[in-house]
Amino acid sequence: MDEIRRGDIYLADLGEGTGSEQRGVRPVLVVQNDKGNHFSPTITVLPITTKIHKAKGLPTHVLIENMGGLEQISAVMAEQIVTIDKVKLFTYLGTLSKEAMKKDINEAIKIQLGLPRRRENGRK
């Protein structure tokens, strides 16, 4: 497998899952830092869904269209951060732009984890 980078989208096997946890083979977005991606046997990802009707209005969901090699409008689910073994990654699909990662994905992760967010004017 080629070097895995933050912002890459892969098909991955998330296993069985319980209740509302995302499960099975599905696209995931790599959110782990690149140093960890290089050295660690595990990888931190966010599941991606095409069930947009459930994603609307949730601040932890980021809609992506015509990005990252996905064929359908999809939503990245920042509330379901998961760490998996790299052997569960299969096919590379594409990469989100650095702008999308910085602006949208990072903000959704901050909301999920309760971290301070930047306001529109750049101040905290």
Regions from the PLM with identified roles:
Residues 15-19:
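Short, charged beta-turn/beta-strand-edge "cap" motif at the junction between a beta-strand
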Residues 20-25, 30-65:
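Compact nucleic-acid interaction/catalytic patches
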